[in-house]
């Protein structure tokens, strides 16, 4: 009988654990993304600030400013006209969690990947595959940004 291939037989344990954590985070992201889509929350954050965007509105004035900005876009005018600030907070926080989780996945993937490259833990074909996954993750983020931008203009 031949032995079945199992990734943990060939990868260092640290790499296997890291990839399993990233995989679990992606599964959670799919669920959060689905809820974001079903609640039509994706366009509630009308600006994209990759660095400073991690900080949500903190004061009542911040929330009012974010809501006023949202009211300027077609989604509010056609779908959510009459929405209250409290309702807006709900959809905003859904999209906020979606974006923050995406950034966190990027960090959890990229930082250990750099560490594994520096230490020589991953090299050869595996290194290229992991770099490809990093590029696919970046492309997914870019597609999300394009989807939001196009939704804000139509």
Segments (PLM) and residue ranges:
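Short, Lys/Arg-rich, polar N-terminal cytosolic tail immediately upstream
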Residues: 1-11
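N-terminal signal-anchor transmembrane alpha helix
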Residues: 15-54
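Conserved histidines in hydrophobic membrane contexts and catalytic metal-binding motifs
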Residues: 33, 97-98, 140
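Interfacial helix-loop-helix junctions of multi-pass membrane proteins
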Residues: 36-47, 141-154
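Long, glycine/tryptophan/cysteine-rich extracytoplasmic
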Residues: 47-77
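Individual transmembrane alpha-helix segments
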Residues: 69-109
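Membrane-interfacial alpha-helical segments at the cytosolic side of multi-pass membrane proteins
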Residues: 103-120, 133
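Membrane-interfacial loop-to-transmembrane alpha-helix junctions, especially the N-terminal start
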Residues: 124-134
